[in-house]
Amino acid sequence: MLVLLSSAYFAPIEYYCRLYAADAVIEERHEHYLKQTYRNRCLIATPTGPLPLTVPVERNGASHTPIGEVRLSDHGGWKRLHWQAIASAYESSPFFEYYEDDLRGAFFGEYEFLVDFNAALRDVCCELLGLHTPVTPSTHYINAASEYPEALDLRTAFSPKKSAAAESGFMARPYYQVFQERTGFLPNLSILDLLCNLGPEARLVLRDGLQA
């Protein structure tokens, strides 16, 4: 099945379940940028619960800026702060040390635009997960109903402000988490959480994460 997805910053597990199950993906790069979404936000685990990490961005002043034109901000040394938070959260996880160099290399690359940064992170995560679903960036805003009527349009399906709905077909399969004795199981965090805690077995959670 062809799936339409938005750009996302270290996207949640549900997003990667869809990547795993898809035959091909088109990533929307011409929609209007939406604030307070996974496009520039991810959730990682901490001893006190989920921690949101938000990428500061710069727009061209228009209220409806295409996401492909949204630039990364240099404000406040956010990359260093985000990486410190990620390392602190997962340095004691079983697989962080094996993936750290690859993740760090992609994270600290030189990027001007948010979508390119997100795509680089997605690509390295897919490589570490062994996912080979082809992902193509859109060349224009897609009218799904007329252009891809058989596609599954999930461009607005994921939000950090709400839990994954059962009707979406996503099933949050429990797995080992570093802080679960303190916080209980935290569902649908960033793919980083699954990858660092389960390593190669993360694919099994992605495989079983959608209802038939």
What are these regions, as identified by a protein language model?
Residues 1-212:
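Residues lining hydrophobic/aromatic ligand-binding pockets adjacent to catalytic sites
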